[in-house]
């Protein structure tokens, strides 16, 4: 499967390296796109090494004027995964804001999109964030629920990056539907 992994600004961004590594090792083609905030938590070089592809971090990375990246990645790939999906990213997509490569790719896509929210429990349980998630689900976006556990901030609650097998199970379920 051709999978775009969008990494957004969350402390859990480093956990997506395991996801990219697993997908690549099982034979999937993986393209990583990172928000600017994601690059503050983990280097794009880590994802480039694991995916064996240049990581996209900007709308304006392209060397070829005829290549429109957000359209290419939104149409020519099988699945888009947003892992971790921050509250900021969920809010932007739920409200049609396409102001970076990640949100532009998601909003331009006609392919399945899987969000993997990961954030502080107070953020995750906030009514605004929950309304954005509800809206996205109603629009047909797929989700892997965050786990409950000790978060990076020292609070225990819902918002933890899910276990890899839970994410892979959902990817395979979506992939099976779209064959």
PLM region spans:
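A cross-family phosphate/adenosyl-ligand binding-site feature
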Residues: 1-114, 120-179
